[in-house]
Amino acid sequence: TMAEFEIPAEVIWAKRGPTFTLYELKLGPGYQIAKIRSIKENLIMRLAIKQIRILTPIAGKDAFGLEIPNKKRDIVGLRSLISSPEFNSTDKGIRLCFGKTLDGTNFIEDLSSMPHLLVAGATGTGKSVFLNALIVSILYKYSPEDVRLILIDPKRVELAVYKNLPNLLIAETIKENAQAVSTLKWLTEEMDRRYKFFEEVGCANIDQYNNGFRDSQKEPKMYRIVLVIDEMADLMMKGKGQVETYVVRIAQLARACGIHMIIATQRPTVQVITGLIKANILSRVAFSVKSGMDSRVILDDPGAEDLLGNGDMIYSSTKGTTRMQGALVELAEIKKVCDSIRANNESVFNDDLLNAITVKPEIEETEIDSSEGKDEKADDFEEMLKQVMLHFIKKGKASISSAQATFGLGFLRAKKFVDALEARGYLGPETTGSQGRTILLTEEEFLSRFDQN
């Protein structure tokens, strides 16, 4: 084909991958590499393909490359990566299944070493499927004691399948912009709390604390937190200043305390992925985008505009750039995983975060003026208080979210019961983490004291 354009070039190596085949070619003497780029559109037409990616030159070689789409693409199932030795060889950090590279290698990355990830791509290119693959990777490998997730889903439907999972920090995905900003604020405060705690106990990071500084018989592990934002553009449109400030601060400081972010957008513009955000998140994934300018925003280089869609992606990090086919996980498989986790595990959610994002106060019932009405209302409160405490004793731990889920209460009403139980000496104070409050009485002791009161 090159001969048709009067360019002497020799194929010196070729390798077929899941999505494309890479051909390495050597130019004849006296020909400039710019000549290859000038015939790109002609090559696409001559080869009857949708797209071609030209690598000029290939680092460390006296050659250039042509990435040409395969007529039949190989599917890279997430299951094959999850069962691979690369994924299961260690439990350290947070292992994520990305996909398969040109030579068929399973590409597994550690989020804790990134320590944050930026994902961008046009609609329908595989971005949402990739996010699901990352989330399911975490669900397969890590318990809620190891990793907890916060899911921000302004589009309201993309991440709804994960609600009420034990691995979530709160039961629902976060949909409202105001709640998302409150979540980011809470995360920065949690980061500060963790660093203050590390200073008090004399350790430098979360791994040191979990592996040596805590009393494993008495103190639970400190879990890592992964924040997933499915569409950054929506947040930046309505609260750019606050969102950017919180995201940058977390990106700069949160690695050692075990807080990580995965931020995705279908609009890789400088208004969404600002210079400050880019400067602090160096691990990035690009799916197919509309233009070379969009590619530069996410990768700092062109190339993503030549990707083929349907999971074809480029991963850029401090270690270099890799093109691969992203892992595929179907919705039916996600539902099966989530249903199994819910059926076999109890959920204990974080009341602190739930409180922080509660923007609309619950409307309290109107008090009845008559003394009879007041007594009746007090009796109702006492009876519900008793049932809530008996539920906590049966479960062995107490939390606002547990009262909400069991009795169908709003947050403020459930909090009122828990605060009353603490004030009467039935429950211990609120603790950091997912362990809930300590129950201070047996069922017999509680019933005896409660009836006396």
Residue ranges with predicted function:
Residues P29-I33, K71-G77, E444-R449:
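Short, charged/polar, Gly/Pro-enriched secondary-structure boundary elements
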Residues T1-K26, G30:
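N-terminal anchoring/assembly modules that precede and organize ATP-driven motor systems
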Residues E10-R16, I54-I58, P429-T431:
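Short beta-strand
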Residues S347-E362:
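Long, charged amphipathic helices and adjacent flexible linkers at domain junctions
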Residues A9, L22-K26, K35, I44, ...:
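P-loop NTPase catalytic phosphate-binding loop
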Residues T1, V11, V359-N453:
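Terminal-proximal interaction/regulatory segments of ATP-powered molecular machines
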Residues G65-I75, T366-D369:
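Short, low-order "capping/linker" segments at domain edges
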Residues E24-I33, S38, G408-L409:
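A short interface-forming secondary-structure element
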